[in-house]
Amino acid sequence: MKGTSEVKPMETHRKLLKPLVEKRRRERINNSLEKLRIFLSQTLKSEKLKNPKVEKAEILECTVQFLQSRKLLPLDREAVDKEYQSGFQHCLETTLHFMNSKPDMNGVTKELLSHQMSSCKPPSDAWSPTCAPLTKHVPSLSYQDSTPHLVSNSISISPTKTLVDSHFTYQTFKTWRPWV
């Protein structure tokens, strides 16, 4: 008798919880479909997708057609390269602006970073989405991580800074963990 009375509250709890879980799942699906409908209506300029009452199956069919058409389109390498170059140039300009706004930055460090960034500027006639090889690097040695650092012919300029020459080898440092 005792076993059956303990099972009933659990079954009741599951029966009450199941509709709530299903309702949340349907809400997530509907929210995602609505976002997809809006994205596709803006991207495809489709009149039928502008209607908020469009069928879910129609949204999914348009999505499949859109993805298939994107797969069949040839990749415009020149446009991709120009977009990459534009983003790269924007990052360089933002970094230079940041460096120039920091009056407390060491003059040698600022000069080395500016030199490095100028060597990364792509030539305008033959652009490929790669940066020139690093010539100087100023790592902070306040802690060590597991990512490989380019190290060779190091010249110490302060207890926490190191200048690195243009011939690099990979050196992996021990991972810093706060709980160790």
Swiss-Prot record:
InterPro entries: bHLH_dom, HES-7_bHLH-O, HES_HEY, HLH_DNA-bd_sf, Orange_dom
Location of the Orange domain: 84-116
Motif WRPW motif: chain residues: 176-179
UniProt entry tagged with the keyword Transmembrane: no
One example of a Gene Ontology biological process annotation: negative regulation of DNA-templated transcription
Induction: Not induced by Notch-signaling.
Keyword RNA-binding recorded: no
Pfam families per UniProt: Hairy_orange, HLH
Tissue localization of expression: Expressed in the presumptive midbrain-hindbrain boundary (MHB) as early as the early gastrula stage (stage 10.5). Expression in the MHB continues through to tailbud stage. Also transiently expressed in the eye anlage at late neurula stage.
GO molecular function, one term: DNA binding
Localization per record: Nucleus
GO cellular component terms, A-Z: nucleus
UniProt KW keywords: Developmental protein, DNA-binding, Nucleus, Repressor, Transcription, Transcription regulation
Residue ranges annotated for the bHLH domain, each copy included: 13-70
PROSITE patterns: BHLH, ORANGE
Chain coiled-coil ranges: none
Superkingdom to which the source organism belongs: Eukaryota
Summary of the function given for this chain in its UniProt record: Transcriptional repressor. Represses transcription from both N box- and E box-containing promoters. Demarcates the prospective midbrain-hindbrain boundary (MHB) region in the neuroectoderm in early gastrulae embryos by repressing transcription of a number of target genes.
Domains (record comment): Has a particular type of basic domain which includes a helix-interrupting proline. The C-terminal WRPW motif is a transcriptional repression domain necessary for the interaction with Groucho/TLE family members, transcriptional corepressors recruited to specific target DNA by Hairy-related proteins.
Protein name: Transcription factor HES-7.1-B
